[in-house]
UniProtKB/Swiss-Prot annotation:
GO terms for cellular component: cytosol. NCBIfam families: tigrfam_recA (TIGR02012). The gene is recA. InterPro entries: AAA+_ATPase (IPR003593), DNA_recomb/repair_RecA (IPR013765), DNA_recomb/repair_RecA_CS (IPR020584), P-loop_NTPase (IPR027417), RecA-like_C (IPR049261), RecA-like_N (IPR049428), RecA_ATP-bd (IPR020588), RecA_C_sf (IPR023400). This is Protein RecA. ATP binds at G84, P85, E86, S87, S88, G89, K90, T91. Keywords: ATP-binding, Cytoplasm, DNA damage, DNA recombination, DNA repair, DNA-binding, Nucleotide-binding, SOS response. Residues 1-24 are annotated as: Disordered.
């Protein structure tokens, strides 16, 4: 028995001696890290705490309520998918994103696969159409190749693709009407996402795909809705936004806008499943003052009793529309309310007030622009 004990102790001591010391492990790790960087380039592997670029930056969406739902705005260097029914505000939402990027000196591109971009409406939302890069590709392969080259250049800050449903494969265009092309668009999107996703992260360019809804056949239970282009985009997208029209805004019998509701269906950079609501006015886009009033009421800066809104004990308007008009006419009070709202929102929140453009300045800028005709509805 004593022999067995001695042999066990000796084997244990041998195993302890065989283990590398902490200093040797660090030396070996640094050696292999250096070898990887020499083989694949600097930055191919890193410690997460040492990489400043791993902190995801954001830029505003144009609606403060949506900025808060997203944790600050759209993430830079990520893929975003915006989907919803027709005339729910998808294109309007992305045009506001383009305007925000251009306002900060960035370069924007719009891949108009649907061939339906309205330059007059885009200009009314604040888009600098003279410096906006626009492409109207003939095929889906051409559109995605253009996106890939723009992303690789690292000179473009945002690319919008309108829409995935309009990215028609070349084989389908060259074929005849009625020819079956099962899964061709899904294969195209899957290949494209594999190719461009890595370059998107390296360049810091945000790529926003607009998508349409379809109904799955034979679904009895559950939601029958699905998006076009297969499942690849769902996996590669860091943020997915489901936008819906929940109300039509009217003055008497005249329709002047819609109430939109956005659900963050997926978010890899902030908590998901948050909901934001805002008004989209025909010819003017997202109502920044409407967003401010909603958040002022939610935070208690503005009190609503019945139909009346009050600020600091004084009634400022009866009904939502009259209160927004009062805010437009009283810029000083508007700025005071905005400051108070931001103070309330940033208490214990990761979203900083500096990460969002002041709404008062945005509202004054929008008020100076002439509204286009009501024919330019929310896309």
């Amino acid at each position: 028995m004593s022999v067995d004990v001695k042999s066990a102790q000796s084997s244990k001591s041998d195993s302890l001696q065989a283990e590398p010391r902490p200093g040797e492990r660090d030396k070996a790790l640094n050696l292999v890290l250096g070898q990887i960087e020499r083989n694949f380039g600097k930055g191919s592997i890193m410690r997460l705490g040492d990489a400043s670029r791993m902190r995801v930056e954001t830029f505003p969406t144009g609606a403060l309520t949506l900025d808060l739902a997203l944790g600050g705005g759209y993430p830079k260097g990520r893929v975003v998918e915006v989907y919803g029914p027709e005339s729910s505000g998808k294109t309007t939402l992305t045009l506001h994103a383009i305007a925000e990027v251009q306002r900060r000196g960035g370069v924007a591109a719009f891949v108009d696969a649907e061939h339906a971009l309205d330059p007059v409406y885009a200009a009314s939302l604040g888009v600098d159409i003279e410096n906006l890069l626009v492409s109207q590709p003939d095929t889906g392969e051409m559109a995605l190749e253009i996106v890939d080259q723009l992303v690789r250049s690292a000179a473009v800050d945002i690319v919008v693709v309108d829409s995935v449903a309009a990215l028609t494969p070349r084989s389908e265009i060259e074929g005849e009407m009625g020819d079956l092309a099962v899964g061709s668009q899904a294969r195209l999107m899957s290949q494209a996402m594999r190719k461009i996703t890595g370059n998107i992260g390296k360049s810091g360019c945000t790529v926003i795909f607009l998508n349409q809804l379809r109904l799955k056949i034979g679904v009895t239970y559950g939601n029958p809705e699905t998006t076009t282009g297969g499942n690849a985009l769902k996996f590669y997208a860091s943020v997915r936004l489901d936008i819906r029209r929940i109300q039509t805004l009217k003055r008497g019998t005249e329709e002047y806008g819609i109430r939109a509701k956005v659900k963050v269906a997926k978010n890899k950079v902030a908590p998901p499943f948050r909901i934001a609501e805002f008004d989209i006015l025909f010819g003017r886009g997202i109502s920044t003052l409407g967003c401010l009033l909603d958040l002022a009421e939610e935070t208690g800066v503005v009190i609503r009793k019945g139909a009346w809104y009050s600020y600091e004990g004084d009634n400022i308007g009866q009904g939502r529309d009259n209160t927004i008009t009062w805010l437009e006419q009283n810029s000083e009070a508007q700025e005071q309310i905005e400051v108070l709202v931001r103070q309330k929102l940033t208490e214990g929140s990761e979203v900083t007030a500096n990460s969002m453009r002041p709404l008062a300045a945005a509202a004054r800028t929008a008020a100076k622009k002439p509204a286009v005709s009501l024919a330019s509805e929310a896309a």
